[in-house]
Every structure is written in structure tokens, then in C-alpha cells.
Amino acid sequence: VLLVSGLTSTVAARTIFVDNLRGHDQCDGSTVDPIDTLVGPVRTFDRALALARQTDTIHLVNTGRPYRGDLRLFGHRHSGFPTRPFRIRGNGSVISGAKPVPTAAWRSRGNLWWMAPRRKGHYLLLKDGNPLPRHSLDTDTPASNLLSIPKGHWASWRGRIYYRTDALLDHGDQNLAIAGDDCGITLYAIRHVVIENLTVRHWRLDGISAPGLCSDVVLRNVICRENGRAGMTISGTSRIRGEDLELTDNGKHSLLVEGFGVADLKNARLTPPPTLAP
């Protein structure tokens, strides 16, 4: 019988490069510049995470164009060790959940337009990449109150988005988008992870969600802004440390901590103050 304590893997950590302009998912992610059809950066998060193993670094090339698609870290494969963490290096990149609204999705009565998003509950309407001003309406308010929406504003009411504008939304590209998928970054059952230098915005629910079983996870110089519900939600038994963190201009919460979740923050900018839920 062989009993060994404190044994860790000696496999060398690698860097996997992701480039949403020049990358290709048939490549191996081993170089920042494309070499040939098989050697060079990958294009998507899914491909990078499929290649990744413990203690690796995923390096996002900041191309100036937002990355689309969510980033999901799960389990042993996307974890590290106390002295050799698994890393996501954003290099100032943006992860965006904005989804263009097809012109055919809009209906109108006069200058009041509406569309029905497939996913309900939290909404965000964007024009030219920026949130439009929102007009608040209660669900039980009568339909006549839709007339109170000011020009250039939008409101959500009974599963629809209403937007008042003189533009013809069903003709030409008005560059309108909604916050699309649920969360930009999801963390579950991971340990010894560092995520740094990126912005997460325009997701339907949360910029970052840690629903459970996370420990020794550090977010450094991360911005979560303009998401539908919260900049970040920590739930279950997750413990997240934030350093130079900014959670601002989100739909309802800057930081939502539920259950036994723990947030350890240093030099954080949160607007409004954090929400602690049972």
C-alpha cells in the first residue's frame, strides 16, 4: 500500500490563445498569431475550454470587438492549485450578451413599437451598443398607461418590450439589440481560479454568476456593467474575492449574495450597495 500526501500534478501549464477575429476553432490555441490551418489561436470560448486542463491560462486577445458567447468554468478541469491557479486573462476585452433585434420582430401602433422577447423576466434594450432610458411600469398597470412612455424611452409590460420612437423600426437597420443569454460568466464547482482584466456587459440576468461550490476564486480588475438583473450573483456555498471590482449600472443589483455565499471585496465600486438575500 502506497500512501502519498500532498501530491499534485507536474504537467506543465499551457496558455490557450483566443482571438475572435483571426482565430479558428480547428486550431490548437498554442500561439497568439495564426501559423497554419491547425496551429494558431482559437475563435470561441467553447473551443478554448474544451482544450483547457488544470492550471492552464486562457488568454483573450483584445481585438477591439466584443466577444460573443458565454464563458462557463466547471469542475476539476477548470480549476488550479493554490500556487498555480487556472487563469482567464482578458487583457481589457469585453464579453457581451447583446443580441440584435430583427426588424421583423417589431409591431407598432403610431410611434409606439413593441416586440416579445423569447426569454421573459428581465430586459434591457440597447441602441448603438448603449442602454436606452427605461420607463418603469408595473405589471398590473392598465394598458392605457403605455401612453405615458416618453419618446426615446422603453418599458417592459406583460412579457413585451415597448419603445416609443418616430423611427420606422421595421424598415432598415436601427442598430437595436436586447440583452440576450442569461449570464456572461458562470462559475461552478471550481477552485483556485483567477479572472482578470475584462468587462462583462449586456446579459439578461447577471454579468457573473457563481451558483455554488466555488472557493479561492479571485476576480481582479473586472467590470460588470449594464446587465439585466445583477452585476454579479454569488449563491450556495461559493466564496468569491474581488479586487478592483466595478459593479455598476445593472438592472436591479450591483452584487446579489444568496444563501451561504461569501463575497470578500477589496477596493470595489458598487452601485447600488450589495443585496443580501436569504
Q: Could you say what each language-model-derived stretch is?
A:
Residues 191-202, 214-229, 238-253, 261-276:
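Right-handed parallel beta-helix
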Residues 1-6:
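Bacterial N-terminal signal peptides
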Residues 11-13:
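Boundary at the C-terminal end of the N-terminal hydrophobic targeting segment
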Residues 17-210, 233, 256, 274-277:
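Extracellular polysaccharide-degrading/modifying enzymes targeting complex plant/algal/animal polysaccharides
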